[in-house]
């Protein structure tokens, strides 16, 4: 974990002088628990969670240092299962109006860097410039690396390879190695699966999306809702993380940031009902309760009356 950004972590010391940090996300803790507590269990593993996480924020930026995250992790299945996680993410996004799920793949950038044989420092500098879309500085830096015109052209166009799913076809023109085309082939296969499932609405592509955490190894995605100034959902594939805890398993997942949603989205409270019934009509009452649960929560309450009746409560 030596490459993980630590400046956004809250750090303190224990009684033995060891440095401890408050968790900044839940992916690492879940990976550790899966690799250790479930080491004798057979994958795949499917986890869900809700927890508070903590990040040091820039002063006066208007962002909370403590936020509530909830999410899912699918551990033990390879990239062919990405579509399962993406469909879950889209089901979350469908609860809001005017949403967008933006999909990228860090392998597209990583494969290019591997072919060019860039150092870790050079990769990090390039990623930072591409992420910020600092085109002038990016061109100056690429020129300093003395790369071929075709490779420079690839990195200069990378920040702009974004839009609807047709951008994947356009991206082939900038591929200078077969490994880059293989990444695009994999993404097109995933997009085709989403289309067959009827889940392609409001999906966009951003091949210039560069992950900030070093454990992402494949597909990455973020969800946006109109009126919220930040992504409310983010996730991706992290096939190398569990290996650090002694068990080599692929994984993919995402988390949902609840706090910005609470601030910007009206929450529709579900109705509450009490259904009174005589013991002789318990089955009929249960059937009626199942229908009512589509509108809200239902409490079944035995009654001395001979008829079933429903009362809505505040």
Set out the residue ranges of the language-model regions.
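Short, conserved beta-strand segments within well-ordered enzyme catalytic domains
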Residues: 9-13, 20-23, 46-49, 73, ...
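Positively charged, Gly/Ser-enriched RNA/tRNA-binding surfaces
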Residues: 25-40, 47-96, 143-314
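Short, conserved phosphate-binding/catalytic loop or strand-edge motifs used
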Residues: 66-70, 103-111
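TRNA-binding/sensing appendages of the translation machinery
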Residues: 1-28, 36, 87, 94
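Hydrophobic mid-domain F-helix/FG-region of cytochrome P450s
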Residues: 91-95, 109-117
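Acidic, His- and aromatic-enriched active-site or binding-groove loops in soluble protein domains
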Residues: 5-14, 117-140, 147, 225
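Internal, well-ordered alpha-helical segments in soluble enzyme and binding-protein domains
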Residues: 85, 105-108, 122, 138, ...
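Cap/lid and interdomain-hinge subdomains that line or gate substrate/regulatory clefts
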Residues: 74, 78, 82, 99-102, ...
